[in-house]
UniProtKB/Swiss-Prot annotation:
Keywords: Cell membrane, Lipid biosynthesis, Lipid metabolism, Magnesium, Membrane, Phospholipid biosynthesis, Phospholipid metabolism, Transferase, Transmembrane, Transmembrane helix
Main location: membrane
GO molecular function, one term: CDP-2,3-bis-(O-geranylgeranyl)-sn-glycerol synthase activity
Classification of source organism: Archaea, Methanobacteriati, Thermoplasmatota, Thermoplasmata, Thermoplasmatales
Cofactor(s) essential for the protein: Mg(2+)
Transmembrane segments: 11-31, 60-80, 86-106, 122-142, 145-165
Coiled coil (UniProt feature): none
Protein name: CDP-archaeol synthase
Native source organism of the sequence: Thermoplasma volcanium (strain ATCC 51530 / DSM 4299 / JCM 9571 / NBRC 15438 / GSS1)
GO CC list: plasma membrane
Amino acid sequence: MNYPLLMAQAIILFVPALIANSGAVLTGGYFVLDRGKNFIDGRRILGDGKTLSGYLGGSFIGIVSGVIIYWISYATHFILGNYGSIALSIEIPAVMAFGSLTGDILGSFVKRRIGIKSGGKGGLLDQWPFALVAFLFLFLMERPFFLHYYFFAGIIVILAIVPPLHRAVNIIGYKLHKKDVPW
């Protein structure tokens, strides 16, 4: 088995989960998910940064990226990896995109519970929950795909690249005035 190629494929095929997170920033801002309400601890449930438009828009952008990856893979005779079929090129990226943004929301929920306000630095709580929940969704809903591309080493590689990639994308978003803070 060609492990370097499999690692590259794992990264490329995970792009919908990564893109969805950035897409949420671009499409967000409308219909705050927690509607301004507080949890039983008196703190906001999620904060103003988690919106329905971001969740749906980011997921849509993630799905579109998956379809694009499928067609590029098809044109290159699947050297970049393969979702399996045209239908799966929509389904698998949808699972990853919705998983990614659900993980981002869960990370925000945990951050609020430990006293980190919306926009505050959360370290790995800002970076890993979206990837971990995308993996969980894949494992639960697309197990054959998950087991082929995301064995132990594939997960480790993704988790290793997420923090610097997340930081770089957030700095770009900050410079483009799409984010209030560069993290």
